[in-house]
């Protein structure tokens, strides 16, 4: 096999592995959430399909595939069908720039456990997170439903508001690492994780990604008591499943990014690097599930106040303080 063919084969293998692992994790994250919420609420949860209910994600997939693909009268056909894909695909693509382990040596060459080591990896992530907003907007607009439209308007306002604080909270990590490349940011945390230097940025980022995931207490776009199911009210079958899976993939991806920027990525003692990265990422996923089971929903005005009058000003002040400290060094 020629070197070029070998490089292509290695890249395709990494893409296939990430695609399989992320989709499997998303499916079982749904199962884990149902079991954890059941434990919080003092009940059993799904335990009938397979041993300990472990085949429940497969049963859910079969149910979604066999549901009727319903489209409301008056809906914009092509935008209605495009929206679920635009919500799910950017989340998967973001994983391309996340380093999930130390480089391996295969066939006499060093292979990074990362699909694309871009020198603008942070900008790539921010760009894809902006594209995902269009899935929410198109899903509500194309459905010809007042509930869906109101949900998409709320979703747009929320995502745009918290993308700003999320992006600003990452600027100090770039200042400390001196690079936008995610592998360089991980390498800069080999001794001390950035959460030690930037606890405020970490808290701002954590709150912002919870809002980006549209999870309780930030599930304003999908508020069941007000908007039925928000921007995906009119979706059924696998198209609803794409919105659903996209949400859980987003949880995994944003947990991986929080690990990369603040918790040292795959760095850690004793255990293999990939195990460390996975454990940290799944800890964030558990945190999101715990929030859903224990916190109430914010009002819309409280949501906007927190984003624009608290998190964004704090992130700007943190950037100024970090720059001032770096100048004095």
From Swiss-Prot:
Annotated signal sequence range: none
Catalytic reaction(s) noted: a quinone + NADH + 5 H(+)(in) = a quinol + NAD(+) + 4 H(+)(out)
GO cellular component: plasma membrane
GO molecular function terms noted in the UniProt entry: NADH dehydrogenase activity; oxidoreductase activity, acting on NAD(P)H, quinone or similar compound as acceptor; quinone binding
Membrane topology, as annotated: Multi-pass membrane protein
Residues that span the membrane, as ranges: 12-32, 78-98, 120-140, 159-179, 191-211, 242-262, 270-290, 308-328
Top enzyme class: translocase
Keywords, alphabetical: Cell inner membrane, Cell membrane, Membrane, NAD, Quinone, Translocase, Transmembrane, Transmembrane helix, Ubiquinone
Known EC number: 7.1.1.-
Function summary: NDH-1 shuttles electrons from NADH, via FMN and iron-sulfur (Fe-S) centers, to quinones in the respiratory chain. The immediate electron acceptor for the enzyme in this species is believed to be ubiquinone. Couples the redox reaction to proton translocation (for every two electrons transferred, four hydrogen ions are translocated across the cytoplasmic membrane), and thus conserves the redox energy in a proton gradient. This subunit may bind ubiquinone.
Subunit record text: NDH-1 is composed of 14 different subunits. Subunits NuoA, H, J, K, L, M, N constitute the membrane sector of the complex.
Entries under NCBIfam families matching the protein: PRK06076.1-1, PRK06076.1-2
This protein's name: NADH-quinone oxidoreductase subunit H 1
Organism placement in taxonomy: Bacteria, Pseudomonadati, Thermodesulfobacteriota, Desulfuromonadia, Geobacterales
